[in-house]
Regions:
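Pyridoxal 5′-phosphate
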Residues: 1-169
Length: 169
């Protein structure tokens, strides 16, 4: 919620789909909240408070039906619950490396459909290891979204954790 609240300070409006007492999303209420300018639905995959897993399959269908982008926060589920971006009709997926993926703190990522990459402005800007002869941020992936020196020890640690998860499963 904090990123959405931060965006609201810059004029972005959002609504919250209500939940039941046990934390289950009341998906039927989503239809009532639609406005002509609704562009996307952002949802967590599972609650960090009560563990309720959200009905992401239904949300993906809802978003497709209404032409909305669908972003899923998998901080609580990545590495523990199978996630298929295509089957869930996700446009983007955020994950943290240090929870279910068992990687180091300070790691994580944001997966986006290729079609969206050119539509998103990088949050940060800085040097890259490629195209150093120009002052412009590279337009190709992944360099477009990698300003400055990456957290190489963290990335290697996350890679090792992912390899371990693959061997264990």
């Amino acid at each position: 919620m904090r990123p959405l609240v931060q965006l609201a300070r810059h004029g972005v409006t959002f609504d919250r789909i209500p939940c039941s007492a046990d934390g289950s999303l009341l998906i039927e209420k989503a239809e009532e909240l639609l406005k002509p300018n609704t562009r996307l639905l952002v949802c967590l995959h599972a609650s960090n408070v009560c563990g309720t897993i959200m009905p992401v399959q239904e949300l993906g269908k809802f978003c497709k039906k209404h032409g909305l982008l669908f972003i899923l926060d998998t901080a609580q589920t990545a590495g523990t619950v199978p996630i298929d971006m295509e089957a869930l009709q996700l446009d983007a997926l955020a994950f943290t490396g240090h929870k279910g993926l068992r990687g180091p703190q300070g790691t994580g990522g944001f997966l986006i459909r290729n079609e969206l990459a050119s539509q998103i402005e990088p949050l940060l800007s800085g040097g890259t290891g490629s195209v150093s002869h120009t002052e412009e941020v590279p337009s190709f992936l992944p360099d477009r979204f990698e300003p400055g020196t990456p957290n190489i020890p963290g990335i290697l640690g996350l890679h090792a954790a992912l390899c371990d998860l693959e061997q264990t499963d």
